[in-house]
């Protein structure tokens, strides 16, 4: 466990808090999140070590850092093997009216600089708010550390008057992405039902409601209108897998 023997300064206190969370997540077998906290906490301890001059405290810090590094390395090896075997599975349950589940909060753990290609299967990228959801998702993809160059979208076509809105909206998104050096390939299917997002680094995310899991904002000037972390959600389940050999649509 992370103990307060590291010292009482603010940097040490922050490191202890992060590492305490890492140990808790580790005990709950939430290894992916635990690894992130271990790595963050270790970096913080290394900064504390640099600013520590007393030899006895430096010795304590080195010992603790070594222990946390060993545990983090073991978790990383375990997760790598799970991914290699195709056994990795994490489930997140989003409760009714829950907040804090913006696309960035949900996906950032899996968006590394190795991500250059993304596949999205979602039958409901049709109505105006759904097009905005897709646009927000694309905005997230072109931010660092990602280096996305191609996005594949498979969705269902809107029949009737809504078809013009859907096609023109997607075309506008396509042109906008193009100005950022990103190609958007759009395909339609009348039989699509599954909702799935895949990255070419092997991560696969299945959301029960697809990208459309946010509730309608109470008004244009209400919290959550722009910041999706503050927007209440519909109840849904998110399943996360890792497949070394990601299939293309």
UniProtKB/Swiss-Prot annotation:
The C-terminal domain interacts with lipid membranes containing acidic phosphoinositides and is required for location at the midbody. SMART domains: MIT (SM00745). Pfam families: MIT, MIT_C. CDD domains: MIT_1, MIT_C. One of its GO terms (molecular function) is phosphatidylinositol binding. It is found in: Late endosome membrane; Midbody; Membrane. This is MIT domain-containing protein 1. GO terms for cellular component: late endosome membrane; midbody. Residues 168-231 are annotated as: Important for association with membranes. Residues 8-86 form the MIT domain. It comes from the Eukaryota. It is a peripheral membrane protein. Homodimer. Interacts (via MIT domain) with CHMP1A, CHMP1B, CHMP2A and IST1. PANTHER family: MIT DOMAIN-CONTAINING PROTEIN 1. Required for efficient abscission at the end of cytokinesis, together with components of the ESCRT-III complex. One of its GO terms (biological process) is midbody abscission. Its main location: membrane. Keywords: Cell cycle, Cell division, Endosome, Membrane, Transport.
């Amino acid at each position: 466990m992370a103990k307060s023997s590291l010292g009482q300064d603010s940097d040490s206190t922050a490191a202890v808090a992060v590492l305490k969370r890492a140990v808790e997540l580790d005990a709950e077998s939430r290894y992916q999140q635990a690894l992130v906290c271990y790595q963050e906490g270790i970096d913080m301890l290394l900064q504390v070590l640099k600013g520590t001059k007393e030899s006895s405290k430096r010795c304590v810090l080195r010992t603790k850092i070594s222990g946390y590094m060993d545990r983090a390395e073991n978790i990383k090896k375990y997760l790598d093997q799970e991914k290699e075997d195709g056994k990795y599975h994490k489930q997140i349950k989003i409760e009714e009216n829950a907040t804090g589940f913006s696309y960035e909060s949900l996906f950032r753990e899996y968006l590394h600089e190795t991500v250059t290609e993304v596949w999205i299967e979602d039958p409901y990228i049709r109505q105006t708010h759904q097009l905005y959801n897709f646009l927000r998702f694309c905005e997230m993809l072109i931010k660092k550390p990602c280096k996305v160059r191609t996005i594949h979208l498979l969705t269902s076509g809107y029949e009737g008057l809504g078809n013009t809105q859907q096609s023109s909206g997607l075309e506008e998104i396509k042109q906008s992405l193009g100005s950022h050096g990103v190609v958007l390939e759009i395909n339609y299917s009348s039989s699509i039902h599954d909702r799935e997002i895949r990255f070419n680094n092997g991560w696969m995310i299945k959301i029960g409601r697809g990208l459309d899991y946010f509730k309608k904002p109470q008004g244009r000037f209400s919290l959550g209108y722009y910041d999706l972390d503050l927007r209440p959600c519909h109840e849904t389940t998110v399943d996360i897998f890792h497949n070394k050999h990601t299939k293309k649509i």
